[in-house]
Amino acid sequence: MRHYEIIFLVHPDQSEQVGGMVERYTKLIEEDGGKIHRLEDWGRRQLAYAINNVHKAHYVMLNVECTGKALAELEDNFRYNDAVIRNLVIRRDEAVTGQSEMLKAEENRSERRERRDRPEHSDSADGDDGDNSDVSDNADE
């Protein structure tokens, strides 16, 4: 069996069906003796260019080990499913199980956002109320 990285884009109006689609595709691979090494749902994202006047899509990425027969059936499912607006299948030399760069970047972005939104401790705890009353207005004294 060979290793593949599969990315497919689902029409944004069909985003609620993504879970069922992923379940159906993973079942198809596993029933043929294949294995899912990584599954990432990247969610709804902006497209680089419009596809059929659609500017956003729901992205899903799979790293699988499967037979050529299962892959052909999966590609047929993509081709005849109107909700899948694009798909890409890349043959890999080995199984990839770590997080993708896309998911790592998203987590880093959310961590930075949390740190930014976290309230800083106030300076009033040291007795300074911020009115600068102890600073002289006259600089040449």
Swiss-Prot record:
Location of region: Disordered: 97-141
GO terms for cellular component: cytosolic small ribosomal subunit
Compositional bias (Basic and acidic residues): 103-124
Entry GO MF terms: small ribosomal subunit rRNA binding; structural constituent of ribosome
Gene3D superfamilies per the UniProt record, alphabetical: 3.30.70.60
Pfam families attached to this UniProt entry: Ribosomal_S6
Biased composition (Acidic residues): 125-141
Signal peptide segment: none
GO BP annotations, alphabetical order: translation
Key words of the record: Ribonucleoprotein, Ribosomal protein, RNA-binding, rRNA-binding
Entry similarity comment: Belongs to the bacterial ribosomal protein bS6 family.
Cross-referenced NCBIfam families: S6
Entry function: Binds together with bS18 to 16S ribosomal RNA.
Protein known as: Small ribosomal subunit protein bS6
